[in-house]
């Protein structure tokens, strides 16, 4: 609602400027829920100009839109957009309409190691659980690739909820096409190793094979080499981060909370969300959970929205 109020003020200001323009001023312009509308430009033809038929006449003037008219038009556009989002939230069983995130930051914040997660070399890819931001946003990430539920793709696309996927090839290779459809819907695909091992038990070379091998798979199958990596189970050592760096990884996001169909689990003592928190979940279904992927999304989104947060795209900040 705060965003709506800001946009209403912007629309009113634009309309007032239009109303004060003379006959040679610009035509109406305004902002809508999805961006800035284009302004038309209406000039005045000179008096006595000969029309094509030879009779002198003045071109008709476009009447400038009044402030109240522009505001009414904006409110109607906003009302329709909100009604559509409300209908989709109801369709998918959400208790509230998800909040919209702010525009992405013009400059991405500097990512550093979370305190206590360092391995002694500050030049290695940083391990973190929260993105440094004052925006009331969190980031939804989904790991591994075991469950390939088409309902998840429809739900997230219709609700326009951004998320990121961290994939392991031993699960993804059962249906590479599912994750290509996900990518085509705007989801970024990242590295979660080839076979999902406990990384600290492996040598540097073995860890490098797991990470670089998955880099190669994702690049070959999906056309882009990831820069983000999440170690299986969140476990890593200095060799893990050295191997990740040598495979082209820039950062290692872990998580602050984990979402299930029936609950949230929390890393922090206050059991709450904070600006920039990363939320983990998994590609799972009724075989592993008491619910489906859609049930998990409903529970997570209700929690996130009720606590006053929007879901933003991780790659816009990292």
Predicted regions and their residues:
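Acidic-and-aromatic substrate-binding clefts and catalytic sites of carbohydrate-active enzymes
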Residues: 145-148, 167-175, 198-205, 230-236, ...
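Structural recognition of the beta-strand scaffold that forms the well-ordered cores
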Residues: 138-142, 163-167, 188-191, 227-230, ...
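C-terminal domain-boundary segment and adjacent tail
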Residues: 124-133, 173, 291-318
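Active-site beta->alpha N-cap acidic-glycine motif
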Residues: 97-191, 195-198, 217
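Intrinsically disordered, low-complexity repeat/linker tracts enriched for polar/charged residues
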Residues: 23, 28, 41-63
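Secretory targeting and sorting signals
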Residues: 1-36, 58
């Amino acid at each position: 609602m705060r965003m709506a109020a800001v946009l209403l003020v912007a629309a009113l200001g634009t309309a007032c400027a239009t109303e004060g323009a003379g006959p040679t001023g610009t035509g109406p312009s305004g902002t809508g829920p999805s961006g800035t509308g284009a302004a038309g430009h209406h000039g005045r033809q000179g008096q006595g100009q000969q029309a094509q038929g030879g009779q002198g006449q003045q071109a008709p003037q476009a009447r400038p839109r009044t402030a109240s008219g522009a505001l009414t038009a904006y409110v109607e556009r906003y009302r329709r957009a909100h009604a559509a989002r409300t209908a989709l939230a109801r369709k998918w069983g959400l208790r509230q309409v998800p909040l919209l995130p702010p525009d992405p930051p013009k400059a991405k914040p500097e990512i550093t190691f979370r305190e206590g997660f360092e391995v002694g070399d500050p030049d290695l890819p940083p391990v973190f659980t929260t993105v440094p931001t004052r925006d009331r946003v969190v980031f939804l990430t989904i790991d591994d690739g075991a469950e390939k539920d088409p309902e998840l793709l429809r739900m997230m696309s219709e609700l326009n909820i951004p998320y990121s996927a961290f994939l392991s090839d031993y699960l993804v290779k059962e249906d590479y096409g599912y994750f290509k459809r996900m990518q085509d819907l705007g989801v970024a695909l990242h590295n979660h190793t080839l076979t999902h091992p406990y990384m600290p038990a492996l040598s540097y070379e073995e860890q490098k094979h797991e990470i670089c091998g998955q880099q190669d798979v994702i690049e070959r199958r999906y056309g882009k080499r990831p820069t983000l990596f999440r170690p299986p189970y969140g476990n890593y050592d200095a060799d893990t981060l050295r191997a990740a760096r040598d495979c082209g990884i820039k950062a290692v996001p872990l998580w602050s909370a984990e979402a299930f169909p029936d609950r949230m689990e929390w890393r922090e003592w206050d059991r709450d969300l904070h600006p920039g928190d990363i939320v983990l979940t998994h590609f799972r279904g009724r075989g592993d959970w008491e619910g489906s992927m859609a049930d998990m999304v409903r529970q997570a989104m209700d929690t996130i929205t009720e606590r006053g947060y929007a879901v933003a795209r991780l790659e816009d900040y990292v």
